[in-house]
Design a protein with these regions (language model features):
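Extracytoplasmic gate region of multi-pass secondary transporters
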Residues: 25-30, 211-270
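Extracellular/periplasmic helix-loop-helix junction of adjacent transmembrane segments
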Residues: 27-59, 252-256
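Interfacial helix-cap and linker-helix signal at transmembrane-aqueous boundaries
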Residues: 32-33, 67-68, 147-159, 244-245, ...
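Central cavity-lining transmembrane alpha-helices of secondary-active solute carriers
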Residues: 51-66, 259-271
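Conserved MFS/SLC helix-loop-helix module at the cytosolic interface between two early adjacent transmembrane helices
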Residues: 59-95
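Helix-loop-helix hairpin linking two adjacent transmembrane segments in secondary transporters
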Residues: 141-188
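C-terminal transmembrane helical hairpin of 12-TM major facilitator-type secondary transporters
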Residues: 247, 259-265, 271, 278-331
């Protein structure tokens, strides 16, 4: 049998490709507005497209992920390659906002295919190392842009944003298809040594399907927490270049930020995933989310004081944000088992779609109406703080029970 780590790193490559469609977007927003000035496009118009891109992917994941548990990931990976190539590759030739929204949404569905496959590979093949395996997979999504953002920026300057969309769409789509060729679900009855499971982690012995999960209140608690912590990082992802322009940050500093923030984003997933396997998911979430709130507030004042401080704060924002995409799937696997992990997580991941609309279009609209990014940053910080406090309550609520089981009124706190 092929080593499970080979499958994990193949999924990692696919995640790098789709990550660029999200984390390189900030480079394209202003060139698109400028190119369509004759149609009176504004920043908020194109940023709504970013929100719809993420929403389309996250909201279709439950339908896509159901195929992984039944047929395996290869078909979805091939489908993703086509959707990403067509959707992303055509964005430079749109003639209206409607076609722009539709094509970026198509790319978003392609992204969802790969994301569902990647998370499934981590949780299914690594029930003993969910934190670190999920961290590696989601790090590819967040970290890959560190290598590609300078290339994207250079291509936009030399061949224009339209051709950059086209050629990167084709190459990314092809690499996604190739990465999917080695991905399969583990065999029936696949298990790992029980001794490898860490005692700090609460885990359920039962596997829940999506309908059983949706009937438990714990799921909606996690959904709200993920929604609130997701907004700040998605806002900075979409608005990094416009914010830098408003803060009068130099081009060199922006280039450095475009490299370091994806590295911080990806590193946060591995770092906090590893910590969570020992410290516990809930304490890790509380610590990281609280720091996220602090750094978002600091960005409104200290971020304006100079290039160095801007870069440092943006790096810290991403270093305390990316972990949500490893901690929540790992926690969901702890609560509801790994058998139906792909489909189960797709429902929780849909929270990102709502967060993207708040962090992209609404944040840009607030800036256009008020002339400052402070409202968007401080509002995101308040929500991150609320999510941090909710993480403390996760430690005290009981593990979910199936409807046929007696519901326990007290659950020992672990970690």
């Amino acid at each position: 049998m092929m080593n499970r780590w080979v499958r994990l790193w193949s999924a990692f490559v696919g995640m790098v490709m789709i990550g660029n469609l999200q984390y390189a977007w900030t480079l394209f927003a202003q060139p698109m507005v400028k190119a369509h000035a004759h149609q009176h496009w504004q920043l908020s118009d194109v940023q709504w497209g970013f929100g719809l891109f993420i929403a389309a992917g996250t909201w279709t994941m439950p339908f896509l992920a159901s195929f992984i548990d039944k047929t395996g990931p290869r078909i979805l990976m091939a489908m993703s390659g086509v959707l990403c190539a067509v959707g992303w590759g055509s964005l430079g030739h749109v003639g209206s906002l409607t076609s722009f929204y539709a094509l970026y949404a198509i790319a978003g569905i392609g992204v969802a295919c790969v994301y569902a496959c990647g998370v499934a590979m981590a949780v299914k093949w690594f029930p003993d190392k969910r934190g670190i395996a999920s961290g590696i997979i989601t790090a590819g999504y967040g970290m890959g842009a560190a290598a590609f953002n300078p290339l994207f920026n250079r291509l936009i300057r030399t061949i224009g944003y339209s051709d950059t969309f086209f050629w990167t769409g084709i190459t990314h789509g092809l690499l996604i298809v190739l990465a999917g060729l080695v991905l399969v679900n583990p065999p029936s009855g696949y298990k790992v040594a029980a001794a490898a499971v860490k005692p700090k982690i609460r885990r359920h012995d039962l596997d829940f399907n999506c309908w059983e999960m949706l009937r438990t209140p714990q799921f909606y608690f996690l959904f709200i927490a993920m929604l609130m912590i997701g907004i700040g990082g998605l806002m900075v992802t979409a608005q990094l270049k416009p914010v830098a322009t408003d803060f009068k940050i130099g081009e060199a500093a922006l280039t450095i930020a475009l490299v370091l923030t994806p590295l911080a984003n990806g590193s946060s997933r591995i770092l906090w995933g590893w910590v969570s396997d020992y410290l516990g998911r809930e304490w890790t979430m509380f610590t990281a989310f609280l720091l996220q709130a602090i750094f978002l507030v600091a960005a409104t004042t200290l971020g304006r004081t100079g290039d160095v401080m801007f870069v440092v704060l943006m790096v810290l924002v991403f270093l305390t944000w990316g972990e949500l995409y490893v901690l929540f799937p790992a926690l969901l696997g702890d609560f509801y088992g790994s058998k139906n992990s792909a489909l189960n997580y797709s429902f929780l991941y849909s929270a990102k779609g709502f967060a993207s609309l708040l962090g992209s279009g609404i944040a840009a609209t607030l800036f256009e109406k008020t002339g400052t990014w402070n409202y968007a940053f401080i509002g995101s910080a308040v929500l991150a703080l609320c999510s941090a406090l909710m993480a403390l309550f996760v430690r005290r609520i009981p593990l979910p029970q199936k409807s046929s089981e007696p519901v326990l009124s007290v659950q020992p706190t672990v970690g």
